[in-house]
Design a protein with these regions (language model features):
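A short, proline-enriched helix->beta-strand linker immediately N-terminal to the Walker B motif
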Residues: 150-154
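Non-catalytic connector elements of ABC transporters
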Residues: 247-308
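Conserved ABC ATPase "signature" C-loop
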Residues: 210-211
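ABC ATPase NBD coupling module
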Residues: 66-81, 105
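Helix-to-loop junction immediately C-terminal to a conserved catalytic motif
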Residues: 49
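Conserved ABC ATPase signature
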Residues: 131-135, 139-141
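Conserved ABC ATPase "signature" region
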Residues: 110-127, 179
């Protein structure tokens, strides 16, 4: 189990990056850390990996304290793996050689088998002999993830792991990677901007705002019962409305066109989204967004209903 207790960190005396962060993570569990740029997500991963000397607090993995550079000649925990946004690959060697870099040469068959297994996970078997320098940024990102998994870690830390990967490839890769981690009982912490990384794959989701934790729960609970606009907006567009004198956070799919309702709105714009239209409208002098199966004429007055 990973136990993070009240950790704080600052690069300079006047610039605190993390403030009183606490959470636990069980073996084989996945935590998604979300927040806007500059909120401290990447710094948290570095702290957990042991790359930083904390201002206060402690980090333990299975009763062993994780200490920073002041205590280690080579910082970082040997049985953790950290995949940063700069991949640190060997550009003039092949994809397979990069993945197998830290595997023993004394067991070539096992090394080849392990490398091929991970090439399947990242969907790059056909690129095994390609030089890394010829790959796109997204492909290099996938190679970096596979290399981190080659010597199976107990905990893997992924910083925006799908940030450079094409959308058409991202969903398939996510399913394969997170299923593989579950199968191998590898704990995982992902720092991301993408709510899809959390909703389908994380056991817990942490939201950081202004260097502090503002929400920590299952992704399902945070999606259905967001504590504030900031949390809801990490998943989707969100409308903050006063309905029956009560403030509500309402996603676009929770607003429907009604045959007859006292809630009226004027359509201003529409955006085709494939399986539906996203409609922008004025409601009580406020811009709102809602989903509709068909386009609606601009300027048309419509009646709306709100669902839970």
């Amino acid at each position: 189990m990973l136990k993070v207790s009240n950790i704080s960190f600052q690069y300079t005396p006047k610039k605190e990056i993390l403030t009183d962060i606490s959470f636990t993570l069980g073996e084989g569990q996945h935590l998604c850390v979300m927040g806007e740029s500059g909120s401290g997500k990447s710094t948290l991963l570095k702290a957990v990996y042991g790359l930083l000397d904390l201002k206060k607090g402690s980090i333990y993995w299975k009763n062993e304290e994780v200490l920073g550079p002041a205590f280690h000649l080579v910082p970082g925990v040997s049985f953790f793996k950290y995949v940063a946004q700069d991949f640190d690959l060997m550009p003039f060697t092949s994809v397979a050689e990069n993945i197998g870099k830290f595997l023993s040469r004394f067991y070539p068959e096992e090394k080849e088998q392990r490398t091929n297994e991970l090439l399947e996970v990242i969907e790059m078997s056909s690129f095994a002999n390609e030089k890394v320098k010829t790959l796109s940024g997204g492909q290099q990102q996938r190679v970096a993830i596979a290399r981190a998994l080659a010597k199976e870690p107990e905990l893997i830390l992924l910083d925006e792991p799908f940030g450079q990967i094409d959308n058409f490839k991202k969903n398939s890769l996510r399913r394969k990677l997170f299923s593989y981690l579950k199968e191998k009982n590898i704990s995982c912490i992902v720092a991301t901007h993408d709510g899809d990384d959390a909703l389908s794959f994380a056991d817990q989701m942490m939201v950081i705002k202004n260097k502090k934790v503002v929400a920590l729960d299952s992704p399902r609970n945070l999606y259905k019962n967001p504590s504030e606009h900031y949390v809801a907006a990490l998943f989707d567009d969100v409308n903050e409305l006063f309905i029956d004198e009560k403030k509500r956070l309402i996603y676009p799919h929770q607003i429907q066109v009604s045959i007859d309702s006292s809630y009226k709105a004027i359509v201003k714009k529409s955006f085709f989204k494939g399986s539906f239209w996203l409609i922008e409208a004025m409601f009580n002098s406020q811009v709102i967004f809602f989903e509709n199966p068909e386009n609606i004429d601009l300027g048309k007055e419509i009646s709306l209903s709100f669902i839970d």
